[in-house]
Design a protein with these regions (language model features):
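Short Gly/Pro-enriched turn/cap motifs at secondary-structure boundaries
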Residues: 37-38, 95
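Short acidic (Asp/Glu) patches
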Residues: 23-35
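Short, basic and Ser/Thr-rich N-terminal targeting/leader segments
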Residues: 12-14, 23, 43, 57
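Short, surface-exposed recognition loops or helix-turn segments adjacent to catalytic cores
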Residues: 13-21, 61-64
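Short, conserved beta-strand element in jelly-roll/cupin
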Residues: 31, 38-56, 86-87
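Non-heme Fe(II)/2-oxoglutarate
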Residues: 1, 24-27, 63
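Signature of the catalytic double-stranded beta-helix
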Residues: 1-17, 38-40, 51
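Double-stranded beta-helix
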Residues: 54-95
Length: 95
């Protein structure tokens, strides 16, 4: 499926991980995966597959629509819990 979406013949899996959080755990802050990897390629594909039901009530994944087209993928540090910092850096994503 990824090959079809990316229009390529094959992929190489560089990294996999399982993120396990308790039901009462803190949410992950806004971030981009690519700047934290040990290589720099805007062509890399990151996917997230939920192993349990992911709902708004229990903290589902949320992507900013269009952010993959506008972001520069350079390491800039985390945004932490201050979502406003994200929109200060990328005002075009603010609604």
């Amino acid at each position: 499926m990824l090959c079809q979406l990316a229009g390529i013949e094959g992929i190489r899996i560089w990294h996999d991980q399982t993120l396990q959080k308790p039901a009462w755990g803190n949410p992950s802050s806004w971030h981009m995966d690519v700047p934290n990897w040990s290589f720099h390629s805007p062509d890399a594909i990151s996917i997230w597959i939920a192993l349990n039901d992911a709902t708004i009530q229990n903290g589902c994944m949320y992507y900013l629509p269009g952010s993959h087209r506008k972001a520069d993928f350079q390491r800039k540090g985390g945004f932490g819990p201050d979502v406003g910092a994200l929109f200060g850096q990328y005002p075009e994503f603010q609604t």
